[in-house]
């Protein structure tokens, strides 16, 4: 399971001209589910993201977590994180999980964030979404539950 984590001042996601998710200060998480991923991967990433110290403390040091700053998370599914661009000019997505499995694990990830006490908004799985964010920092991290990077 892969995640792109971006610290934001605010973010929103729109589907069919309707805002379906919106946050203020917090994190936007683009989550991709891969072949062979399981609920343990979802738990690992949700717990890791909940505790990452990537917000500034009083001295301007990255020392506070999303929980410490009482921020929110906007979680958006994104199978294209498993795009393989090594051959040709069109990405291949054979590394991405099947939609039913991906949906189940994405929902497990979101539920774990909520269980960790985080206010969490989402996009709509398998829909075309317009995502608007205002990056803060910028702070952008790549996480992989298999620790591939």
Swiss-Prot record:
Signal peptide per UniProt: none
GO process terms (BP): D-amino acid catabolic process
Coiled coil spans: none
Matches recorded under SUPFAM superfamilies: DTD-like
Catalytic activity, as annotated: glycyl-tRNA(Ala) + H2O = tRNA(Ala) + glycine + H(+); a D-aminoacyl-tRNA + H2O = a tRNA + a D-alpha-amino acid + H(+)
One cellular component (GO) term of this entry: cytoplasm
A GO term for molecular function: Gly-tRNA(Ala) deacylase activity
Keywords: Cytoplasm, Hydrolase, RNA-binding, tRNA-binding
Record InterPro entries: Daa-tRNA_deacyls_DTD, DTD-like_sf
The keyword Methyltransferase is annotated on this UniProt entry: no
Residue ranges of the motif Gly-cisPro motif, important for rejection of L-amino acids: 137-138
Gene3D superfamilies per the UniProt record, alphabetical: D-tyrosyl-tRNA(Tyr) deacylase
Top-level taxon of origin: Bacteria
Compartments where found: Cytoplasm
Pfam families: Tyr_Deacylase
Documented EC number(s): 3.1.1.96
Domain observations: A Gly-cisPro motif from one monomer fits into the active site of the other monomer to allow specific chiral rejection of L-amino acids.
Function: An aminoacyl-tRNA editing enzyme that deacylates mischarged D-aminoacyl-tRNAs. Also deacylates mischarged glycyl-tRNA(Ala), protecting cells against glycine mischarging by AlaRS. Acts via tRNA-based rather than protein-based catalysis; rejects L-amino acids rather than detecting D-amino acids in the active site. By recycling D-aminoacyl-tRNA to D-amino acids and free tRNA molecules, this enzyme counteracts the toxicity associated with the formation of D-aminoacyl-tRNA entities in vivo and helps enforce protein L-homochirality.
Quaternary state and interactors: Homodimer.
Family: Belongs to the DTD family.
Name under which the protein is recorded: D-aminoacyl-tRNA deacylase
Organism per entry: Desulforamulus reducens (strain ATCC BAA-1160 / DSM 100696 / MI-1) (Desulfotomaculum reducens)
